[in-house]
Every structure is written in structure tokens, then in C-alpha cells.
């Protein structure tokens, strides 16, 4: 697990882009509001990965919501982690769930969900959803607001 004590933060310094999701470092920082329940949302409107069969690019709009525990996810490290999927071959379901699980394992949130809204390939859009468990009582969680794919219909 990445902590500020074990590895230095990538924030504020030049770092190389990671070549694979496994190589990418996710950083966390202490949550100064750890006694308060609140929601953090990351929107990734231009996620890309590769189809593991054809090597063709796949595109998605990702929404990551989490209720922080003792740690916050540092956004520059998230950007680098997301970019590491650009040449990674995996199915939509695997990419979406892998991202959610990796973030959850690194920052230990009270709750986390990810929505992967994948653009059509072969005429079929695929939406993938994963979460760690039940939403904490009293937490305001807005809808992700990504409309179902309609094409010209």
C-alpha cells in the first residue's frame, strides 16, 4: 500500500508516465475531515483502453464516487493511473472493476462506487457498475448523471 512514509508523492514533481496499471502508483493523503461523512467524485470523461482481442481502442466515461475514511485519493496519481490503461488490453468489465478495487484497496474508503459508461463497439454500449457495499447512512450521493447511450434514436 502506498503511503507518504513509504513512497514520496508524485504531486509537485516530474514523473514518468506508467506503462501498465500494475506499474502505476496510487498516492493517498490524510483526510483532514475524517470525522465527517462526505462524498468525493472524480469524473473521467475520456478514459481509453484497448480491446484484448482486436487491439482496437475502447472509450468510456468513468464516474468514481467515494466516502473517504482516513485517506483521500491524490488526483495527480489517479490521472497517471488512468493514463496507464491507454495501452492496456482488457474487457470493459475488467477495467471498470479493476479500477474500483485498486482504489478501494489503497485508500480504504467508507464506501466507493464506480460507473463505467462505455461507448459502443459492434453497436452495443456496455455500462459496468461496482461498489464496495451499502451507502453509509445519511450520506448524500447524487446520481452519476450519465445518460444511457441513445445514438440517433
Swiss-Prot record:
Pfam families according to UniProt: QueF (PF14489)
EC class: oxidoreductase
Main location: cytoplasm
Organism: Bradyrhizobium diazoefficiens (strain JCM 10833 / BCRC 13528 / IAM 13628 / NBRC 14792 / USDA 110)
Keywords noted in UniProt: Cytoplasm, NADP, Oxidoreductase, Queuosine biosynthesis
Catalytic activity entry: 7-aminomethyl-7-carbaguanine + 2 NADP(+) = 7-cyano-7-deazaguanine + 2 NADPH + 3 H(+)
SUPFAM superfamilies listed in its UniProt record: Tetrahydrobiopterin biosynthesis enzymes-like (SSF55620)
TM annotation in the entry: none
Protein name: NADPH-dependent 7-cyano-7-deazaguanine reductase
Alphabetical GO biological process terms: queuosine biosynthetic process; tRNA modification
Domain of life: Bacteria
Gene transcribed to yield this protein: queF
Assigned EC number: 1.7.1.13
HAMAP family: QueF_type1 (MF_00818)
Function: Catalyzes the NADPH-dependent reduction of 7-cyano-7-deazaguanine (preQ0) to 7-aminomethyl-7-deazaguanine (preQ1).
Pathway assigned to this chain's UniProt record: tRNA modification; tRNA-queuosine biosynthesis
The family this protein is said to belong to: Belongs to the GTP cyclohydrolase I family. QueF type 1 subfamily.
Subcellular location: Cytoplasm
Residues where substrate binds: 73-75, 92-93
GO molecular function terms attached to this record: preQ1 synthase activity
Active site: 51, 58
GO CC, alphabetical: cytosol
Amino acid at each position: 500500500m502506498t503511503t507518504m512514509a513509504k513512497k514520496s508523492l508524485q504531486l509537485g514533481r516530474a514523473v514518468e508516465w506508467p506503462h501498465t496499471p500494475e506499474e502505476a502508483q496510487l498516492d493517498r493523503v490524510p483526510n483532514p475531515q475524517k470525522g465527517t461523512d462526505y462524498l468525493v467524485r472524480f469524473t473521467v470523461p475520456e478514459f481509453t483502453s484497448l480491446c484484448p482481442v482486436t487491439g482496437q481502442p475502447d472509450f468510456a466515461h468513468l464516474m468514481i464516487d467515494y466516502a473517504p475514511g482516513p485517506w483521500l485519493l491524490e488526483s495527480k496519481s489517479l490521472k497517471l493511473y488512468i493514463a496507464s490503461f491507454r495501452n492496456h488490453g482488457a474487457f470493459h468489465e475488467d477495467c471498470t472493476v479493476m479500477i474500483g478495487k485498486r482504489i478501494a484497496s489503497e485508500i480504504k474508503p467508507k464506501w466507493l462506487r464506480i460507473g463505467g459508461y462505455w461507448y459502443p463497439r459492434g453497436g452495443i454500449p456496455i455500462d459496468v457498475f461496482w461498489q464496495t457495499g451499502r451507502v453509509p447512512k445519511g450520506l448524500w450521493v447524487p446520481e452519476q448523471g450519465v445518460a444511457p447511450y441513445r445514438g440517433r434514436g
